[in-house]
Amino acid sequence: MSGISFKSFVQSQYTPIPLPNHDFTGQTILITGASRGLGLEAASHFYRLNASKIILAVRDARKGPECIAFVRQYNPSSNTTVECWELDLTNVETIRQFVAKAKNLARLDAVILNAGMATMSFQAIDGMEKTLATNVTGTFLLAIGLLPALRLSGLRNNIRPRMVLVSSQGHEAAAFAERDADDIFAALNDADKTDMTDRYDTSKLIQLLAFYALKDTVDKSWPDSITFTAVDPGLCDTDLTRDIPLLIRIIHRIMKMLLARTAEVGGRCLVLGAADDEHSHGAYFKDGVIGSPPVAVTDPEGVELKNRVFSQLKSLLYSVDPQIMDACPVMESDEEAIRLN
């Protein structure tokens, strides 16, 4: 694990995660990647903690009834509303429809950006490698599209909504060889040159950089309006690695048997990260504990890379769906974005 101390990783994995006890009464919580794993387990915790409405964003709407039944199983008589909304982060039209639907919510307290994928084979969707399309461009087109709904919810209900990114310690291991390219995303989408064995870690680093840059952008235009928090749930026993080669999957399976947290415990981390609406702004939760942002986004090199990545990402997102971007007042095209277009 380049950039990661194995000793600290093991210690982290064996750190107990407390059961969340925050009261979410009256709140509406939206979770992406909620058909399985951490997202579904987090939804169950929000349900237990009295959330008023839980929105499960799932790629396959046919799984909706099963997901809702899982969340409701421990207290079927609860007054909490659980809904499934279709969302495929590689499909711009479903993102557009999802954002439009969210605008009709009377209240939106927290958005948990949990959906993600990992693969080592290059597969392009509309010209974008699938891991990037899911973990980066789709995630941030959705996040930016939901910002106006969060802002309006805050004003209407006198609250400070939260946007929570599910991160990964893997960002510390990312080689990210494309970081010095004139056009980072074009380099990442070059099937002949890019290293897919590094793709997941690199996507999580880009995700983290862009998330903190988005936080900075919102802070300037809408100060004290939305809390941005990143959460590292650690290695968890989910099927995230189901699409990687068999031999590596077997190695991962052994590592998970020895070190992984259960999906339920990982789900606790997401809930803990979403519980605080003020003091956790800009924080990075690890092992269920609030901490400072990673060095990757705070040291001079990281700050420069953060701003450059986000500038190029904005340009890319404007080319993907200018309507969603223009609908968010804080997303103004800067000179770099215009140049790249």
Swiss-Prot record:
NADP(+) binds at L38, K63, D88, N114, Y200, K204. PANTHER family: DEHYDROGENASE_REDUCTASE FAMILY PROTEIN, PUTATIVE (AFU_ORTHOLOGUE AFUA_3G08550)-RELATED (PTHR24320:SF252), RETINOL DEHYDROGENASE (PTHR24320). It comes from Gibberella zeae (strain ATCC MYA-4620 / CBS 123657 / FGSC 9075 / NRRL 31084 / PH-1). Short chain dehydrogenase; part of the Fg3_54/C64 gene cluster that mediates the biosynthesis of the octapeptide fusaoctaxin A, a virulence factor that is required for cell-to-cell invasiveness of plant host. The 2 nonribosomal peptide synthetases NRPS9 and NRPS5 form an assembly line which likely utilizes GABA as a starter unit (loaded on the unique module M1 of NRPS9) and sequentially incorporates seven extender units composed of the residues L-Ala, L-allo-Ile, L-Ser, L-Val, L-Ser, L-Leu and L-Leu, respectively. One of its GO terms (molecular function) is oxidoreductase activity. Its EC number is 1.1.1.-. Pathway: Secondary metabolite biosynthesis. The active site is at S167, Y200, K204. This is Short chain dehydrogenase FGM9.
